[in-house]
């Protein structure tokens, strides 16, 4: 059950998609609603995007975008993801940066007082770690307003506004993966286990991928299965 501050009128929820996928980059979404709009998300039967088919995600994403007060998504393609994780040296630091960028954008664009908003995040790091990551970032002036009020484990199942954000993020990631599939003329597998090595081998043998820079355009280089495969190649 999600608990709200007595003075809040607005809710922001955020989630990411692609974090556990070897192929593709990452997409982070945040949704802003007036608290009274929760019933609208209930009526749409918004739920955890991982329980939905790609087709249903696409349909729900369109409905959510026209229902909520505001929303925003940051999409990193594989190259951007790889460059940023290499420079930041920590995926969770990158995620903290992206989520906070979304909070800042929604708060400023809609001219909201922070005390009127409850921010909830699908927890990828507990509050203490999140604060540590936030303190390492230099691109925010007032960091206190960007700290979520609620860190919810499996937040998509506990908060409708996080679930809505998870659907928008998943929709963006699906679209990104479809574009990558078209680019290499191959259906790249989702997740990080089944079919990953076969897909990497196909790209190497059938699509002429022989350099790290080529794989960097489609896969996450910091994933162990990708790293292991690339170490076997002779450059």
UniProtKB/Swiss-Prot annotation:
Highest taxon above the source species: Bacteria
EC number: 3.1.26.4
GO biological process, one term: DNA replication, removal of RNA primer
Alphabetically ordered keywords of this record: Cytoplasm, Endonuclease, Hydrolase, Metal-binding, Nuclease
Cofactors required: a divalent metal cation
Enzyme class, spelled out: hydrolase
Subcellular location, principal: cytoplasm
Gene Ontology MF annotations: metal ion binding; RNA binding; RNA-DNA hybrid ribonuclease activity
InterPro entries hit by this protein: RNase_HII/HIII, RNase_HII/HIII_dom, RNaseH-like_sf, RNaseH_sf
Reaction catalysed by this enzyme: Endonucleolytic cleavage to 5'-phosphomonoester
The keyword Protein transport belongs to this UniProt entry's keyword annotation: no
Binding site for a divalent metal cation: 15-16, 122
Result of knocking out the encoding gene: Probably essential, it was not disrupted in a global transposon mutagenesis study.
Cofactor binding note: Manganese or magnesium. Binds 1 divalent metal ion per monomer in the absence of substrate. May bind a second metal ion after substrate binding.
Localization annotation: Cytoplasm
Domain RNase H type-2 residue range list: 9-235
A Pfam entry, by short name: RNase_HII
GO cellular component labels: cytoplasm; ribonuclease H2 complex
Family: Belongs to the RNase HII family. RnhC subfamily.
Chain's role: Endonuclease that specifically degrades the RNA of RNA-DNA hybrids.
Protein name listed in UniProt: Ribonuclease HIII
The species this protein was found in: Mycoplasma genitalium (strain ATCC 33530 / DSM 19775 / NCTC 10195 / G37) (Mycoplasmoides genitalium)
